[in-house]
Amino acid sequence: MPLDRQWIEQHIPHKGRMCLLDEVLSWDAARIRCRSATHRSADNPLRLHGRLGAACAIEYAAQAMAVHGALVAASAPLASTVSTSVRGSIGSTVGYLASVRNVSLHVARLDDLEADLIAAAERVTGDGRTVLYEFSVWSAQQPLVSGRASVVLDATFGLPSVNTGTHA
């Protein structure tokens, strides 16, 4: 089964032009590497005033993290028999990028790079609710952006329920 753009779109929340990754190059339980050429596209949805700033590479890395979560969840030993709510705790629910830290931008923009982007993420630690990744994005062996990201896998966990009914 090729882990191409079509597969990626079926397994992450972003569709159409907002799906920024073209293929998974490699992955295992701890890390992933993905390729993309969408930074050169004039209709890239992250472009502003005709430019794609380097900070947008964080979104490329975040999508790689989402793909990694989907792959890990799908490869779990009981993935086909585990309930959706339990499977969600190992990566198949929608995750939310909660924070990024120690971000280093080594270039000003991405759209002027001729070579494809490589987005890589490595799981540092995590549990059923949050995951900490180290990420990097580079092009033609040139580092572009790196940092750490916290991903919340179940954003509703631990929040009080909200009563939306009317008051008398």
Model-predicted regions and their roles:
Residues 5-15, 87-91:
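Short aromatic-glycine motifs in intrinsically disordered, low-complexity regions
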Residues 2-9, 36-38, 48-52, 146, ...:
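RNA-interacting cores
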Residues 16-53:
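Catalytic strand-loop segment that frames the active site of acyl-thioester-processing enzymes
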Residues 67-118:
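Hydrophobic beta-strand-centered segment that forms part of the acyl-chain substrate-binding groove
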Residues 124-168:
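Mixed-charge, glycine-accented linear interaction segment located at domain edges/termini
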